[in-house]
Amino acid sequence: MSDIRFTDQHEWVRVDGDIATIGITDYAQEQLGDVVFVELPEVGKDIAAGDEAAVVESVKAASEVYSPVSGEVIDVNSDIEKTPAGVNENAMGDGWFIKLRLADPSELDKLMDEAAYSEFVESLQ
């Protein structure tokens, strides 16, 4: 069973075993508008929790995507590099950014669950 957690910077992480899939939330892609460019890290790169993991550019702004957890990049979503609009179309699914081999599962405890994140987003509106 996978478990999904959220940051206050609107990144999500879905964990399945020791693999963490990371992307941006629907709220984030709505705020960005039409995504026109995505820059992803190289496979094999070690990323610490809170470090820049990717860059996403939209018609409105460029924004860094920070990793919610630490680990080694084991896969990147080349589909969204080729077709960045995939982030807008399915941010929480096929629009994922990177997959990491999770270094420290306890980092997940610092992140919000879905209910807490929903409350957080409501507080912003």
UniProtKB/Swiss-Prot annotation:
What cofactor requirement does the entry state?
(R)-lipoate
Which cellular component, as a GO term, is one annotated location? cytosol
Enumerate the spans annotated as Lipoyl-binding domain. 19-101
Keyword terms of this UniProt record: Lipoyl
Which residues does this entry mark as bearing N6-lipoyllysine? 60
| GO BP terms in the entry | glycine decarboxylation via glycine cleavage system
The record's remark on the cofactor is:
Binds 1 lipoyl cofactor covalently.
Question: NCBIfam families, alphabetically?
Answer: gcvH, PRK01202.1
Subunit-structure text: The glycine cleavage system is composed of four proteins: P, T, L and H.
Q: What does this protein do?
A: The glycine cleavage system catalyzes the degradation of glycine. The H protein shuttles the methylamine group of glycine from the P protein to the T protein.
Q: What is this protein called?
A: Glycine cleavage system H protein
Q: Which organism is it from?
A: Parvibaculum lavamentivorans (strain DS-1 / DSM 13023 / NCIMB 13966)
